[in-house]
Amino acid sequence: KKFIGIGSALMRQQEVFDGVEERYFFENVVDFINSKVFNSLADEVILLKGARSFGFDQLTELLVKKVHETVLEVNLNAVVDNLNWYRSFLKPETKLVCMIKADAYGAGAVEIAKTLEEHRVDYLAVAVADEGATLRRNGIKSNIMIMNPEMSSFKTLFDYELEPEIYSFRLLDALIKAAEKEGITGYPVHIKFDTGMHRLGFNPRTDIAQLIEKLRHQNALIPRSVFSHFVGSDNNDFDSFSAEQFKLFDEGSKQLQSAFSHRILRHIDNSAGIEHFPERQLDMCRLGLGLYGINPRNNEIINNVSTLKTTILQMRNVPKGETV
């Protein structure tokens, strides 16, 4: 998209680069450094190529200095290593959802999404529709799940082919109405069961009959998956309760599946559950904190992903008794 040529030879051959969207030419490095083009560089990936005689070493130094003194370095290779570590617990056919909400917990959602897409993750998941739209605008084509869809965001969901979590009858009714108004049929959604977390979700004991009735008597939406969330898969003290949760989810999800001819993916294992309950991986698992290097089972680092670096501004020797 952008080409910057330095040197008299390139100055004479400018027409060769007529097909480049943005192109600039300078007689020497000093002219480039003093130009508006250099001062406007921001959020760029820059490839420097040229002989030492051009003095690109001083250019490199100045470009590095343009970076903030406090930076968060994200190691994408470590992300892949963590992904593969958790995949080692899964059967080859088990699908994987990777959580990249809140800008991938500060690691940079677009960059993380591109890396995960390259490594064939089945689903990405973000909190709200705007996050999903940003990924789409940056070329992400993977399935994207929206965990907290807002009723004001339905148009964004449809425009960017984002798949919402459905956790209440109010949300379900509103989304059906919006989809029917747009003439949409068969739009994929993900059904949330509350098996003990008590945040969001349908009660698989008391709500299942009404849920099936509503889903079967419309064709705007289809359940793509059904899922729940372990309360304490990171703590052995909750193992009995986790077993109760799984039993409740297993029964409710099978009842939902029996009402439809197409396959509905089931998932309940999170990062800790993948390691602690591999026998409960079902059709799909959700990988969150573990992807970023934190093992929720012991709070130890698997492969460190993020490193915060800064500069010490000043070191002071303060006499005892002085205020700080």
Feature locations, PLM:
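Short hydrophobic/aromatic-enriched beta-strand-loop microsegments
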Residues: V20-N28, V67-E69, K141-E150, E163-S168, ...
